[in-house]
């Protein structure tokens, strides 16, 4: 990740950490791993969706326009999603279905792991 992406990700993590620290999940406290699974799972799914758009040839501007229409999304989270879009479009568009599927899976996994690694560091003292 680039410096601006790291700064944006830290803001995202701080917001999510604040939400997680007061959250109650199904009448029991959410554990650190539960929080990581929920938040980073959502990031992975979003990254998969964006990379799928990339691999089918959708224009980056369309993805940005859809993101900009999200009125209820907090700005730091929206900015982080924008960085995911930028990162996806820095990757090549593949011509074969097999390579496209691999690119989608690898990108989703990469974004999930980036999120999980950052949360592990930020939440190290909790639980």
Q: Residue spans of the language-model regions?
A:
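Compact alpha-helical subdomains of small soluble proteins
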Residues: 58-127
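N-terminal secretory signal peptides
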Residues: 26-67
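N-terminal signal peptide c-region/cleavage motif recognized by signal peptidases
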Residues: 21-23
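Sec-dependent signal peptide recognition
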Residues: 5-15
